[in-house]
Amino acid sequence: GFTHAASGHMAMELFKLEGSKCGPKDKDCKGLFMVGIPYRGGGPMMQDLLGGQIPLMFINQDTALPHVKAGKLRALAVSSLQRNALYPDVPTIHESGIPNFQALSWSGMSVAKGTPQPIVDKLEAAFRKVMTSPQTKQWLETKGFVVPEPGGAPYAKFVASEIDLWTKVIKTAGIKPE
């Protein structure tokens, strides 16, 4: 098998699970077997990748870009369903043969349950204003990020889908808290 690295290793676990699915026509399919290496963050992981101690990793596109441009790393695929503007010639994992694979790096703003609705509304309006401003969108897009539809309802739906996905990955991979 291969060794791989990821700070949280969840994207790689999803990759291993999805890449190991063999269809009925795949008589020679052996599955995908990899050994995870726990890291305490992307910095040490990147050093080991650049130093040749590990052969591959999942990392955010903005972190990898300077190393790709310098010729020190080769981007093999992006983990979104659409190609990334920073890497227009790099296929998606979906295009590379693992259907519907998607592992996104994302951030959002959340408040505690029970926060008074007027406060939620005020925060959401301010967040929407910032996220829809041309300056913010342009800055995020130059870093390779996709700006989603802002608002509590789309965000809650997205978070619920992420919880569902990663819960399945955790259970299927047999991941236990340490």
Task: Give short role names for the model-derived ranges.
Residues 1-178:
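Conserved, function-defining micro-sites of small-solute handling proteins
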